[in-house]
UniProtKB/Swiss-Prot annotation:
Outcome, altering C979S: Abolished protease activity and ability to desumoylate CGAS
Keyword terms of this UniProt record: Cytoplasm, Hydrolase, Immunity, Innate immunity, Phosphoprotein, Protease, Thiol protease, Ubl conjugation pathway
Similarity comment text for this entry: Belongs to the peptidase C48 family.
EC number: 3.4.22.-
UniProt-listed Gene3D superfamilies: Adenoviral Proteinase, Chain A (3.40.395.10)
Protein name: Sentrin-specific protease 7
Species of origin: Mus musculus (Mouse)
Record field: compositional bias (Polar residues): 272-282, 891-909
Domain of life from the UniProt record: Eukaryota
Biased segments, Low complexity type: 192-208, 379-399
Length: 1037
């Protein structure tokens, strides 16, 4: 063949070398390298064929040359119509593996896609990469059988692949993952399947190899992806064959011995085209299934919608010239849409594994004879796509193919109807395959080929409700054979679509019982009582009659489960199941029992008592409640949601005589160890819970012990007795009057007031007033008593009480004067301006706090020399203040040194008297700081101002300057109920450790420990009870 003809310009992408006539010279190699360097931005090497050597390569050593045309600038040549004026010739090209060059190594490190698509020698699978180019790149090659006698050189053919994603326009679609999985096949015909693409152009690569492995290079494509594409789209390729080599469109049936089962591998050959009209709609890109995201390995057959719509390998007749590119693109798009409705089974698909590096594939020779009838049946029936197709699904992070091992699936469908039997050879790793062409919804229904023992295949439904996925035909078992040594049978992956859920099963519970009581009837068991949501079945026997009573749960009113803890009856059962039936259901009960002893007029027939063999377990009790809850929900009877207690059930039948109800006659009477006739006494006993009886059970028990002929007796609390809180429900009783008579103004404390001393309760005003009086009279020193006055807890409430204006005598009075008139009688016997400390308990919004008016007779702060006793107290407060300041001051070094100097000077000058500050102020001691302090202080200032006018007959202004308000830091409460307790403790601590120096600031954080508050309630309770006993003794004397 001529290298080039005159008048024809050689394409830049064509690399032509002669076979045995002329070896590639260094100059040619330099040209090749230069061409590759120019296209460095668009080159993507993905072929691992460089490692396919020797007899394992599908390239026959007898063939010395191979031709490939990579023309990116001739769209018509790429479409199958050669340029006019050019002579017809056969080109031969030596494929170069870019992975061995520096440029290839660079791309191998940077590009994310590292796998290559390998094909069997008899078929080239071309999947369209997600392209961002407007051009549609299609490559179609056929190898001429005329060159089958030529021998290829020793060098292994290599393929240069171009990835359009590396262009400037394609980079913005890099986020779309590529979906290119190839299939291995040893069929004799060429088939090209195309994935749905999201780009404006479709990438197709086609190769056709005959059974003699002869090759013919041509530019015309032959799209055979769908059966809807007319034959005219492949006409140009057929005409080119006829012109160049005279090859007829009919291809001879392959001979089994000519097949090389070990040859695998083919890379994509991509060609660019400038046709911008050939495009898919963008909406199709949104539904493109991304197979690379499927990491799961499984085994399954193919759904009809999962199979690509690829035409069968039938003889194609050459008709006419190919239409324009836009027409071809439209037909391809229509065929892609129809592929989800009427799929045809793809032939000769084989699973393969893709690796970032080239992977060695070792083939296992299989000399099986073809099965013509099986293959022809698969080719003729579109309903057997599950048996004749397999899809490849490869995870980019998993390595499937192992070096030296391979998986081969051979299928053939020759025109004459002859075929060969498909054979599957497995590798050391499970091979995951999926369809090469999937619809927009199939990514949710990933079907996977399952590897298991020979002649067995199983499917698993994943993400779909179609029952056809769980069905396997006999043809699938015949077409796929898997060795069992590497992949044993796994029953865990079987189809579980027919498993019935546990929720559909009814709840059922059985009890072993000893007796059943229905009205006057007592029966012995003949089995277990069964509880379900629909019925309750009770098998029993009365005399010689065996009865199986079935109670409809819709007629059940209440149920009860009672257990007795009485040790006296330990020989008997301690569990009773109680069923209360509807009165209109008694006729059906009588019909089932066939006993004239039952009377519909008797209320006792509504009750069924089941004496259980033993106490039921907690699990059985919970299940019984679940069944009753289901019955309650089903029938709308809310009473069945909880069991009926014995106390509520006893009044239902306690008025019945033992002759009417056998339960009272047999079980209840014997359990009480009383005569049968004593019906009135029997009703006072209970099986499980104490009834409303006058008999009081002792709360103690005797323990007897014999030792050395002597008996010892001890009394302890009954272990069965439960401690309950005792609440006095009787009349209110006055416990104490404090101070007791003959002192006037005594305050009475009742038993109701004592209850507020329980933990978590709020203290009422009676307890507050009682303890304040007690502190003033019993705890305070005589000096403090003379200098102090305590108002009642009602004082501030009366002072701030709102009254109707009509009740006021003089409407011209100010607000402060009106308030003072309400409490003017509270100080008629005392002058508060002669006191140093006036305590005012305040309650606002159920919160107690204390207000202390200090030195109301002073108009400004006064400093006095304190006596020796007060000086020691003052020094303690000062040291406490210094310690607090040391903790709060960040400059601790200077503060500590200053305190040390002060202490030294104090020790030296002990004889020097200290000054004590008396400041008129209002102290607010609040354990929660939740009150409106400013309003309280202002109300007290206004009261003092009016009281001063009344007592001193002069006017004096109590303002913020001469009567300041102070809020010292005091111990705080840690709950929401101890505010009253803290108020009492503030007053008690004030009397025990009074504030002698009012120099600011005043720190009282460590005024008293916290544990004092924890026991304060109990201390007050004991005090009241102690006073109660004292006053009772005094009254009795």
């Amino acid at each position: 063949m001529d290298r080039a003809r005159p008048g024809r310009r050689r394409a830049s992408s064509e690399i032509v070398t002669e076979g045995k006539r002329k070896k590639s010279s260094p100059a040619d190699l330099q040209k090749i390298t230069k061409l590759l360097t120019v296209k460095s931005e668009d080159v993507l090497a993905q072929s691992p064929l460089s490692k396919l050597r020797g007899s394992e390569c599908w390239w026959t050593r007898s063939l010395r040359n191979k031709v490939i045309c990579l023309d990116h600038k001739k769209p018509k040549a790429a479409r199958g119509c050669p340029p006019k004026g050019l002579p017809k010739r056969h080109l031969r090209v030596m494929l170069t593996n870019v992975l061995w060059t520096d440029l290839g190594r660079e791309f191998r490190k940077t590009l994310p896609r590292k796998d290559a698509n390998l094909c069997a020698p008899s078929k080239v699978q071309s999947d369209s990469l997600p392209s961002t180019s407007v051009d549609s790149i299609e490559t179609c090659q056929r190898l001429d059988p005329l060159h089958q006698s030529l021998n290829l050189s020793e060098r292994t053919p290599r393929v240069i692949l171009t990835d359009i994603r590396q262009t400037e326009l394609g980079r913005k679609y890099l986020k779309i993952p590529p979906v290119t999985e190839a299939s291995l096949s040893d069929t004799a015909n060429l088939k090209s399947e195309q994935l749905s693409s999201s780009s404006d152009g479709s990438l197709e690569s086609c190769q056709s190899v005959n059974h003699h492995k002869s090759f013919l290079s041509e530019s015309g494509p032959k799209p055979s992806r769908t059966g809807d594409v007319p034959a005219k789209e492949a006409a140009c390729g057929g005409q080119k064959q006829g012109d160049d080599g005279g090859v007829t469109p009919e291809m001879a049936a392959p001979h089994p011995k000519d097949f090389n089962t070990g040859n695998k591998g083919c890379d994509y050959l991509e060609e660019g085209t400038s046709n911008k009209n050939t495009s898919y709609s963008y909406s199709e890109m949104d539904h493109t299934p991304v197979s690379r995201k499927r990491k799961k390995r499984g085994r399954s057959n193919f759904h009809d919608s999962h199979n690509s719509k690829t035409s069968l390998d039938k003889p194609t007749e050459h008709t006419k010239e190919e239409e324009n590119d836009s027409s071809v693109s439209r037909k391809l798009e229509e065929s892609g849409e129809d592929s989800h409705q009427d799929p045809a089974p793809p032939e000769g698909l084989a699973p393969e594994s893709l690796e970032s590096e080239a992977t060695n594939l070792r083939s296992f020779a299989a000399g099986q004879e073809p099965d013509a009838s099986a293959a022809s049946g698969r080719a003729s029936s579109p309903n057997k796509s599950l048996e004749s197709s397999a899809s490849s699904e490869v995870s980019e992070n998993s390595s499937v193919a192992v070096k030296g091992e391979a998986l081969t699936l051979k299928e053939a469908s020759p025109p004459g109807g002859s075929s060969e039997e498909s054979q599957l050879l497995i590798s050391a790793e499970p091979i995951v395959v999926s369809s090469d062409e999937e619809g927009p919804v199939e990514h949710k229904n990933s079907v996977i080929l399952k590897l298991q023992p020979p002649h067995e295949i199983m499917s698993e439904n994943q993400g779909t409700s179609d029952p056809q996925l769980s069905e396997l035909t006999l043809g699938a078992c015949e077409s796929v054979q898997v060795t069992s040594e590497l992949f044993p049978y796994n029953p865990d992956v079987e189809n579980i679509s027919c498993i019935k859920s546990n929720s559909e099963m009814d709840l059922k519970l059985d009890f072993i019982f000893t007796c059943v009581y229905i009205g006057k009837i007592k029966g012995t068991p003949k089995g277990c009582v069964t509880f379900t949501k629909k019925y309750i079945k009770i098998p029993f026997q009365v005399s010689t009659n065996e009865i199986s009573l079935t109670v409809d749960t819709a007629r059940l009113k209440r149920f009860g489960l009672w257990e007795s803890k009485d040790e006296d009856h330990s020989k008997r059962s301690h569990a009773i199941l109680f069923l209360w039936l509807s009165s209109d259901y008694l006729q059906d009960i009588q019909t089932q029992l066939e006993n004239p002893m039952l009377s519909q007029q008797s209320k006792a027939n509504e009750f069924i008592f089941l004496e259980l063999n033993s106490s039921i377990s907690q699990r059985e009790e919970l299940k019984l409640k679940d069944i009753m809850m289901e019955i309650s929900t089903k029938n709308g009877n809310l009473h069945l949601s909880c069991p009926l207690p014995w106390v509520q059930a006893l009044p239902l039948f306690q008025d019945l005589s033992p002759q009417e109800i056998s339960f009272l006659h047999y079980y209840y009477a014997s359990a009480s160890a009383l005569p049968t006739a004593a019906g009135a006494d029997m009703k006072k006993k209970s099986v499980s819970q104490p009834s409303n009886s006058d008999t009081i059970k002792p709360t103690y028990t005797f323990l007897h012990k014999q030792s050395s002929g002597c008996y010892s007796l001890s009394i302890t609390s009954s272990p069965e007795e439960e401690w309950q809180e005792v609440r006095n429900t009787g009349p209110v009783q006055k416990l104490i009057v404090y101070p007791p008579p003959p002192t006037k103004g005594g305050l009475g404390v009742t038993n109701e007031d004592l209850e507020c001393l329980e933990e978590g309760e709020f203290l009422n005003d009676v307890i507050i007033d009682f303890y304040l009086k007690y502190l003033l009279l019993e705890k305070a020193s005589d000096e403090l008593v003379e200098r102090s006055h305590i108002f009642s807890s009602f004082f501030y409430k009366c002072l701030t009480r709102k009254e109707n204006n009509l009740t006021e005598d003089n409407p011209d009075l100010s607000v402060a004067q009106r308030r003072h008139r309400r409490v003017r009688t509270w100080t008629r016997h005392i002058n508060i301006f002669n006191k140093d400390y006036i305590f005012v308990p305040v309650n606002e919004s159920s919160h107690w706090y204390l207000a202390v008016i200090c030195f109301p007779w002073l108009e400004e702060a006064v400093y006095e020399d304190c006596p020796q006793t007060v000086s020691q107290q003052f020094q303690g407060q000062q040291s406490q203040h210094d310690h607090k300041m040391t903790d709060n001051d960040p400059h601790t070094t200077s503060t500590v040194s200053t305190s040390a100097e002060d202490s030294q000077s104090t020790e030296v000058n002990m004889s020097v008297p200290k000054k004590m500050c008396k400041r008129p102020c209002i102290l607010i001691l609040d354990s929660l700081k939740a009150a409106s302090i400013q309003n309280t202080v202002q109300n007290l200032r206004e009261y003092l101002e009016v009281e001063w006018e009344v007592k001193r007959k002069t006017h004096r202004e109590f303002s913020k300057t001469n009567m300041v308000d102070l809020c010292p830091k005091v111990p705080k409460q840690d709950n929401s109920s101890d505010c009253g307790v803290y108020l009492l403790q503030y007053v008690e601590s004030f009397f025990q450790d009074p504030i002698v120096n009012f120099e600011l600031p005043i720190h009282l954080e460590k005024w008293f420990p916290r544990h004092v508050i924890k026991t304060k309630r109990e201390d007050i309770r004991e005090l009241i009870l102690k006073l109660h006993l004292q006053q009772q003794k005094g009254g009795s004397c």
